[in-house]
Structures are given as C-alpha cells and as structure tokens.
C-alpha cells in the first residue's frame, strides 16, 4: 500500500474515531443503551488503530527533526554518529508501524466477530479417541472461561468407556471465531491409555470443526425438509428424565445431517438448540462451496481449515505439543490447561503475514 494512501485511510479512521467520541458524549445517545453499546464497540475497535497512527505521526515528526539536526551538525562527527543511530531506530520503528497499520487495514473476515459452534468427533483409536475428544472439549472450555466467553455443551453422544463419540459446544462472546477458527482440523494424541497394561503408546485422533453461528436470514431452512422425532433424555434431570420425551432427533432430508439434542430440560429448548446446530452446519457447507469456487477467498485460516487436515500432535511422553502448520513446539500441560494464547497468536501472525504478502503481490 502506498504510504500516501495509507495515511489517507488512517486519517479517515481517525476522523471516524473522533466522531464516535462526540456521539458518546451526546445525551440523547446516552439515554439509548443499545445504540450507546454499539457506538462504544465501534470506538473500541478503532482505538488501537488510532493510537498506532498517532505514534506513526509522532515518529515521522521525530525523523524530520533528527534530519534537520543532522544538517546542522555536519562538522561534529560525534553528534552526527549519535543522530544517525537515533535515525536508524526511528526508521525501524516507522517501518514496523507501517506494516502493523497496513495489516490492520486489510479486509477482515466478516465472520471473525461471531460466536461459534465447536463440533468435536472421536476419530481413529476407538475408546481412547472418545476419551481424547473429551479432553479437547475440556481444553476449549478452560480457554473460553479464561477469556470470559460463555461455553456450554448443547449436544453430546457419550461413549460407554468415557469421553464422547461426538460433542457440540456453543461458545459465545466477542470475536470467538477470529481465534478458534485456527482449531479446525485433526488433533492427534500419542500417549499410553489407562487401559494399556503393557505400557505401549497408542495414537488416537479427534476432529474439530469450527462453525460460525449463522443468522436465520443467511441460512433459510424449509420446514418441510426437516424430520423431527423425540426421545427420552438421559443424564441429569431427576424423575423427569425417563417420563418426558425432551430430547430432539432432527434430520435434514436434503443433506442427511442428523442432530440429536438432549442437553436442555425442555423439548422446545432442545428443538431450538438443534436448529442452531443445523443452521451452523448448513452455513459451513455454504462456506466450503464458496471457497471451492474462489480459492483466493478461503476461510482465512492457517492451512485449509479442512477438518481432515492434521494440524496438531499432542505427545504425552515428551510433554510436547507440535503445531504442524507453524512447525513449532509448545509445552503440553499448559495447552491442555487451556493456555492456548501462544499457539493461537502464532497462527494469527502467520495468517497476517501471508495476507500482507498476497496484498503486496496484488499491488505489484
């Protein structure tokens, strides 16, 4: 991006920021909580950009002042050396800010702000794969709780030996998809199962699909294409469990997608949850079709985001987690405890670097 173009766009953003601050001071808006929240959210998004822009302007001014000072001290070699050293640092800072601001102005994935449905399925490895699926679910639950998201299981198929054959988790909060989209794919574990008497290491897998929540307007579902059955829920619920059919078994006939929802206490709530899951699954199909038609506009994920792509290996013997997209290793225990920030931010940095390279290629 040309420097003059960058500055022009940043000035527009700065003007928008000032305008939003003026609106926040407006008594009429202050009396409208919904509008106030919307404006405050927009202001919060722009604030880091404006702060970096102001730092860029300050750095530019310091560079100009240093160059003028250099002209005035041509005969003083010691002073000239000090000024050149300062100029080198300032130019380096300026280049860093330009790259950071250029990335910030690149087109965003419109789904980044959304909440998601996480679908975790046991893969190869039998009962151990089901246990591993449960471990992954707890990892994401801990990560979400640390950030302040609302994490809730909404559909589960438990294994007889523990863990889950399949589990769908609702994760609600700000910008959930922007972070969890990097978790889509195959997660492989290498460890000695509790049931292994010979101490042999087994390899098991679980697949994770990250589905941004879809608005009913985006995904229209024909009621005539849905087959709904009911069943008695199992699990917590006291005497109500086996007497009332609260579970919902939903089938979308055109795609064959089946959703079995038991987590809520009423049939109506389970039906609503089942429809949310179905809508997210259909939305994911739409996204994949769009991405297949236009490769340059893929899911903006590191790798393909395909649930069949192996993205990470968790090695218990060596206490090591390897992210295959990054080619980097991380300590195992903190990752399983929900401390995913380092790996997610590394994936984000890799994504931003690739986006910047693509942008520069298109500019040339």
Curated annotation (Swiss-Prot):
Methylated by PrmC. Methylation increases the termination efficiency of RF1. Keywords: Cytoplasm, Methylation, Protein biosynthesis. Pfam families: PCRF, RF-1. Disulfide bonds: none annotated. InterPro entries: PCRF, Pep_chain_release_fac_I, Pep_chain_release_fac_I_sf, Prokaryotic/Mito_RF, RF-1. GO terms for molecular function: translation release factor activity, codon specific. One of its GO terms (cellular component) is cytoplasm. It is found in: Cytoplasm. It comes from the Bacteria. The modification N5-methylglutamine is found at residue 239. SMART domains: PCRF. Belongs to the prokaryotic/mitochondrial release factor family. PANTHER family: LD18447P, PEPTIDE CHAIN RELEASE FACTOR APG3, CHLOROPLASTIC. Peptide chain release factor 1 directs the termination of translation in response to the peptide chain termination codons UAG and UAA. This is Peptide chain release factor 1. It comes from Prochlorococcus marinus subsp. pastoris (strain CCMP1986 / NIES-2087 / MED4). The lineage of its organism: Bacteria, Bacillati, Cyanobacteriota, Cyanophyceae, Synechococcales. The gene is prfA.
């Amino acid at each position: 991006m040309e420097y003059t173009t960058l500055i022009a766009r940043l000035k527009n953003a700065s003007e928008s920021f000032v305008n939003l601050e003026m609106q926040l001071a407006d008594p009429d808006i202050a009396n409208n909580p919904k509008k106030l929240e919307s404006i405050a959210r927009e202001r919060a998004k722009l604030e880091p950009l404006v702060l970096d822009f102001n730092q860029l302007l300050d750095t530019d001014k310091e560079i100009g002042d240093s160059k003028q000072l250099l002209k005035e001290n041509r005969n003083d070699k010691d002073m000239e050396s000090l000024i050149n050293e300062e100029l080198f640092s300032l130019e380096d800072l300026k280049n860093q800010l330009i790259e950071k601001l250029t990335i910030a102005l690149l087109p965003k994935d419109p789904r980044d702000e959304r909440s998601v449905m996480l679908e975790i399925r046991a893969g190869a490895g039998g009962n151990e794969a089901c246990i591993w699926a449960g471990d992954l679910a707890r990892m994401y639950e801990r990560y979400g709780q640390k950030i302040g998201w609302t994490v809730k299981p909404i559909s589960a198929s438990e294994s007889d030996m523990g863990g889950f054959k399949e589990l769908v988790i609702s994760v609600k909060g700000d910008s959930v998809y922007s972070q969890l989209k990097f978790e889509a794919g195959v997660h492989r574990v290498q460890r000695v199962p509790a049931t292994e008497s010979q101490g042999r290491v087994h390899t098991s897998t679980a697949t994770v699909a990250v589905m941004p929540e879809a608005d009913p307007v985006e995904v229209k579902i024909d009621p005539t294409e849905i087959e709904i059955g009911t069943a008695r829920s199992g699990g917590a619920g006291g005497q109500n469990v086996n007497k009332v059919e609260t579970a919902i078994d939903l089938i979308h006939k055109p795609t064959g997608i089946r959703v079995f929802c038991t987590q809520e206490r009423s049939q109506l709530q389970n039906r609503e949850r089942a429809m949310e899951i179905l809508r997210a699954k259909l939305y994911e199909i739409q996204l994949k079709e769009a991405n297949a038609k236009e490769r340059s506009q893929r899911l903006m994920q590191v790798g393909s985001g395909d649930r069949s792509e192996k993205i990470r290996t968790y090695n218990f013997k060596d206490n090591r987690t390897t992210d295959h997209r990054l080619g980097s290793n991380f300590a195992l225990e903190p990752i399983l405890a929900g401390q995913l920030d380092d790996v997610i931010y590394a994936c984000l940095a890799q994504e931003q670097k690739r986006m910047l390279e693509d942008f520069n290629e298109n500019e040339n």
